Amino acid sequence: MARPRTHDDALRLKLLDRAGELISADGPKALSLRKLAADVGTSTTAVYSLFGSKPDLVNALYVEGFRRFGERLRAVARTGDAVADLVSLGLAYRASAQADPHLYAIMFTRSVPGFEPNAEADRLARATLEPLEETIRAGIASGQLADVAPEVITVSSWGLVHGLVSLELSGNLPPEFSVGGAYEKALRANATGWLATP
């Protein structure tokens, strides 16, 4: 009979989530492997067995954040209506950030000084924008969106959603500002601004 695996994917995900919470709440100095292991109810041996080292753990956090983010964006159903699809992708972006704010900080704010993702992690991060790029290319090809370089629309759209989401998560918006309503209107205004003119 095979021995049960004690260091499984469930433990790996618990460790990643807790590590992200520690970093986003108290900064990278709060990430002690001993504290992390204790918080999750395991041993430091398990942490080293699953990740190898502290830098490898941070890289795994980065990868996991983009894996979840990419999964959510790829799950958005395409309707063929460029504006509706761009709005839906923007809403999925925000939902992903809200679901995993502790990972979002590691993905986009370089909250761990000196951390540089390895080549595979960097490739995965760049691939998460493919659903947005594909939607824009399809919108241009169908004549719905303006015939401009797709990268211009991609970066502009990404900048809008990333900026608003980052301001929201960091608490830098005025308390009376209703993010939900303004966010969707901003997404729609951006998308319609890129429509082809007759």
Question: What is each PLM-predicted segment?
Answer:
Residues 11-20, 36, 61-65, 69-73, ...:
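Generic hydrophobic, amphipathic alpha-helix propensity
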Residues 14, 18, 22-56, 60:
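Helix-turn-helix
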Residues 63-88, 117-126, 141:
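Amphipathic alpha-helical linker/stalk segments
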Residues 1-10, 198:
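N-terminal intrinsically disordered/low-complexity leader segments
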